[in-house]
Structures are given as structure tokens and as C-alpha cells.
């Protein structure tokens, strides 16, 4: 599923991401934009053999199990396939675990490079939330 910007913002808000660990909703919407272009089915292969999955491009080396990543940890305790569902509940649950890990949203390269330090409120502007 490819979400509309405001549709995604509303879903993320409903699932408790607004100000989760101090990160406003705009940060999460911005991260999703630049990680997956709001597409739940996005996947990207990394040079280390791991793969990033879903709307927030969650990595199989640490966070989920795809059955093909050497030395995978599966900290979120989920198959990576659930991160590709239209329903983002599991992706959000895992993202909460990731952002609680010490590096905050710096875990997402696209967030660090394109959202951090910018006016992320623009990502939720005009949305009925």
C-alpha cells in the first residue's frame, strides 16, 4: 500500500508515534517519505547482505527475521514479511523498539540526512489529525 501523507500521519498518530521518545509526528512522516516514499512494500538490499523492509525500511540484521540474513538478531521478534503489510501496526511497534535503543531516530539514515534539524511540521501541515 502506498499511503497518502495525511493518511499515514493519522495512522501513526493513532498508533502512538506522535512525540514518542520526544519525536514529533512530522519526524516520523518525514522518515517514511525518504525511506520508502510511503510504500509499505518497499524493500532495499544492503551491501552486508541484510535487507530493509517496509514503510520505515526496518533492517533484517537487527530487527526482523527474513530467513536469509547471516547473524540476524531479530530484536523485534517478527518475520520481516509483516513489515510489508498495508496495516502498519507491527512496523510501528518495531520502530518504537528501535527508537528506544539509544540512538533515537538516528537509526534511520534518511531521517538523519533529510529530516533532522529541518522544519518537520510541514509533513503534517493541512492534515486533520
From Swiss-Prot:
GO terms for cellular component: extracellular region. Disulfide bonds join 6-127, 30-115, 64-80, 76-94. It comes from the Eukaryota. Its EC number is 3.2.1.17. It is found in: Secreted. Lysozyme C is capable of both hydrolysis and transglycosylation; it also shows a slight esterase activity. It acts rapidly on both peptide-substituted and unsubstituted peptidoglycan, and slowly on chitin oligosaccharides. This is Lysozyme C. It comes from Aix sponsa. The lineage of its organism: Eukaryota, Metazoa, Chordata, Craniata, Vertebrata.
Amino acid at each position: 500500500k502506498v499511503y497518502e501523507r495525511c493518511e499515514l500521519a493519522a495512522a501513526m498518530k493513532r498508533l502512538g508515534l506522535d512525540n514518542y521518545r520526544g519525536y514529533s509526528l512530522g519526524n516520523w512522516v518525514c522518515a517514511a517519505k525518504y525511506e520508502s516514499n510511503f510504500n509499505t512494500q518497499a524493500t532495499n538490499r544492503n551491501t552486508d547482505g541484510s535487507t530493509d523492509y517496509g514503510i520505515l525500511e526496518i533492517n533484517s540484521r537487527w530487527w526482523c527475521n527474513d530467513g536469509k540474513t547471516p547473524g540476524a538478531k531479530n530484536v523485534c521478534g517478527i518475520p520481516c514479511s509483516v513489515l510489508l503489510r498495508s496495516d502498519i501496526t507491527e512496523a510501528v511497534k518495531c520502530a518504537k523498539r528501535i527508537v528506544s535503543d539509544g540512538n533515537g531516530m538516528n537509526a534511520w539514515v534518511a531521517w538523519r540526512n533529510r529530516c533532522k534539524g529541518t522544519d518537520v511540521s510541514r509533513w503534517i501541515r493541512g492534515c486533520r489529525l
